[in-house]
Amino acid sequence: MSWRGRSTYRPRPRRSLQPPELIGAMLEPTDEEPKEEKPPTKSRNPTPDQKREDDQGAAEIQVPDLEADLQELCQTKTGDGCEGGTDVKGKILPKAEHFKMPEAGEGKSQV
């Protein structure tokens, strides 16, 4: 048989977003005039003249030399250039047969 017990889940009471004091104050009419919002400094829909000015600025952006950055990154990580890897080429790794792998139970036990 499976055990059926009472659920321990209890929903949390909902909290109001604002304290009751502020809600009452917000509902009362005020004699103050509403503040006028400042117009945005830049419109989201630029005129054709503004678009042309922005496009001219984009032409001045220079693309960095990615190859030079890659070489610099390789030198900082390895202390040597990436192209130099000739010392690695041509070396033959020893066969796995030459290595003795310890069997289970051999070697020092660490307790």
Curated annotation (Swiss-Prot):
Pfam families: GAGE. It comes from the Eukaryota. Residues 1-61, 77-111 are annotated as: Disordered. Residues 86-111 have a biased composition (Basic and acidic residues). Belongs to the GAGE family. This is X antigen family member 2. It comes from Homo sapiens (Human).
